[in-house]
């Protein structure tokens, strides 16, 4: 049996506020939606310009096959000792350096990739 829109509205109108809230939650879960109202932007409302990221984190995703070369590259970039650099490489994925400029991050990524590592900038 299929209900008409009028029958559904009438049935909802007979429910208490708490029952309607429960119904909304059930509908959100069932259909994977939210009941938040859509806000229409006026013509004068412009989207704010996306700020360019200024600080990056260099993340060693994978050391690759040339682990010794990657350890050397990590030591050069960070100034860490052999043991500490090896721990960073062995612990991949992990952070190599944080809060660096875009230029430094790109240079570090290039050096690590040339050494055989897979690198991400965040």
UniProtKB/Swiss-Prot annotation:
Sorted UniProt keywords: Ribonucleoprotein, Ribosomal protein
Any one Pfam family match given in the protein's UniProt record, by short name: Ribosomal_L12
GO BP terms, alphabetized: translation
GO molecular function annotations of the record: mRNA binding; structural constituent of ribosome
Domain of life: Bacteria
Quaternary structure annotation from Swiss-Prot or TrEMBL: Homodimer. Part of the ribosomal stalk of the 50S ribosomal subunit. Forms a multimeric L10(L12)X complex, where L10 forms an elongated spine to which 2 to 4 L12 dimers bind in a sequential fashion. Binds GTP-bound translation factors.
Entries under NCBIfam families matching the protein: L12
Family: Belongs to the bacterial ribosomal protein bL12 family.
Function summary: Forms part of the ribosomal stalk which helps the ribosome interact with GTP-bound translation factors. Is thus essential for accurate translation.
Name of the featured protein: Large ribosomal subunit protein bL12
Organism from which the protein derives: Stutzerimonas stutzeri (strain A1501)
Name of encoding gene: rplL
